[in-house]
Amino acid sequence: MRPLNDYLNSFLFTELLRGLRLTARHMVFRRSITLEFPEERAPKSPRFRGHLALRRYPNGEERCIACKLCEAVCPALAITIDSHQRADGTRRTTRYDIDMFKCIYCGFCEESCPVDSIVLTRLDTFHMERRDERVADKQKLLAMGDKYESQLAADRAADAPYR
């Protein structure tokens, strides 16, 4: 009886059918977890590291004090800062450039900044139409910070207990 049973099992592919049933149970009849990307967005953490931005104080003055710590700590050497001394003795940046092709979005610049001037936003989809747009200058970074200031402030407040 055993040889006949083995012959019928191999002839009818019962092992194959059992494997296909298991595959169908786990693949076909499960709910899909894929997102339709342009229409649906995955939720992002307040610590998400996206596009860089420069922040301002509530009175409109830029926060950057030109200490150049972010430039020194950047492992990719993507940040370039030039500064000058003002009449009141404080330093301010005349040039603040970030090469977006070099930047690895590690967040070291954000961590090293003593006045929370440079921050990483939640913006994850950005593009450039020309190669010379890869360098984000001070005006572009300040505009990005102005645009997302409410979200940046909320993210900083949510992350405050862990800093």
UniProtKB/Swiss-Prot annotation:
<keyword id="KW-0408">Iron</keyword>
<keyword id="KW-0472">Membrane</keyword>
<keyword id="KW-0830">Ubiquinone</keyword>
<dbReference type="GO" id="GO:0048038">
    <property type="term" value="F:quinone binding"/>
</dbReference>
<dbReference type="GO" id="GO:0005506">
    <property type="term" value="F:iron ion binding"/>
</dbReference>
<keyword id="KW-0677">Repeat</keyword>
<feature type="domain" description="4Fe-4S ferredoxin-type 1">
    <location>
        <begin position="54"/>
        <end position="84"/>
    </location>
</feature>
<keyword id="KW-0004">4Fe-4S</keyword>
<keyword id="KW-0520">NAD</keyword>
<dbReference type="GO" id="GO:0009060">
    <property type="term" value="P:aerobic respiration"/>
</dbReference>
<keyword id="KW-1278">Translocase</keyword>
<keyword id="KW-0479">Metal-binding</keyword>
<dbReference type="Pfam" id="PF12838">
    <property type="entry name" value="Fer4_7"/>
</dbReference>
<dbReference type="GO" id="GO:0050136">
    <property type="term" value="F:NADH:ubiquinone reductase (non-electrogenic) activity"/>
</dbReference>
<feature type="binding site">
    <location>
        <position position="70"/>
    </location>
    <ligand>
        <name>[4Fe-4S] cluster 1</name>
    </ligand>
</feature>
<dbReference type="GO" id="GO:0005886">
    <property type="term" value="C:plasma membrane"/>
</dbReference>
<keyword id="KW-0874">Quinone</keyword>
<comment type="similarity">
    <text>Belongs to the complex I 23 kDa subunit family.</text>
</comment>
<keyword id="KW-0997">Cell inner membrane</keyword>
<feature type="binding site">
    <location>
        <position position="74"/>
    </location>
    <ligand>
        <name>[4Fe-4S] cluster 2</name>
    </ligand>
</feature>
<dbReference type="GO" id="GO:0051539">
    <property type="term" value="F:4 iron, 4 sulfur cluster binding"/>
</dbReference>
<protein>
    <recommendedName>
        <fullName>NADH-quinone oxidoreductase subunit I</fullName>
        <ecNumber>7.1.1.-</ecNumber>
    </recommendedName>
</protein>
<comment type="function">
    <text>NDH-1 shuttles electrons from NADH, via FMN and iron-sulfur (Fe-S) centers, to quinones in the respiratory chain. The immediate electron acceptor for the enzyme in this species is believed to be ubiquinone. Couples the redox reaction to proton translocation (for every two electrons transferred, four hydrogen ions are translocated across the cytoplasmic membrane), and thus conserves the redox energy in a proton gradient.</text>
</comment>
<feature type="domain" description="4Fe-4S ferredoxin-type 2">
    <location>
        <begin position="94"/>
        <end position="123"/>
    </location>
</feature>
<feature type="binding site">
    <location>
        <position position="109"/>
    </location>
    <ligand>
        <name>[4Fe-4S] cluster 2</name>
    </ligand>
</feature>
<dbReference type="InterPro" id="IPR017900">
    <property type="entry name" value="4Fe4S_Fe_S_CS"/>
</dbReference>
<feature type="binding site">
    <location>
        <position position="103"/>
    </location>
    <ligand>
        <name>[4Fe-4S] cluster 2</name>
    </ligand>
</feature>
<feature type="binding site">
    <location>
        <position position="67"/>
    </location>
    <ligand>
        <name>[4Fe-4S] cluster 1</name>
    </ligand>
</feature>
<dbReference type="InterPro" id="IPR017896">
    <property type="entry name" value="4Fe4S_Fe-S-bd"/>
</dbReference>
<feature type="binding site">
    <location>
        <position position="64"/>
    </location>
    <ligand>
        <name>[4Fe-4S] cluster 1</name>
    </ligand>
</feature>
<keyword id="KW-0411">Iron-sulfur</keyword>
<comment type="subunit">
    <text>NDH-1 is composed of 14 different subunits. Subunits NuoA, H, J, K, L, M, N constitute the membrane sector of the complex.</text>
</comment>
<keyword id="KW-1003">Cell membrane</keyword>
<feature type="binding site">
    <location>
        <position position="106"/>
    </location>
    <ligand>
        <name>[4Fe-4S] cluster 2</name>
    </ligand>
</feature>
<dbReference type="InterPro" id="IPR010226">
    <property type="entry name" value="NADH_quinone_OxRdtase_chainI"/>
</dbReference>
<feature type="binding site">
    <location>
        <position position="113"/>
    </location>
    <ligand>
        <name>[4Fe-4S] cluster 1</name>
    </ligand>
</feature>
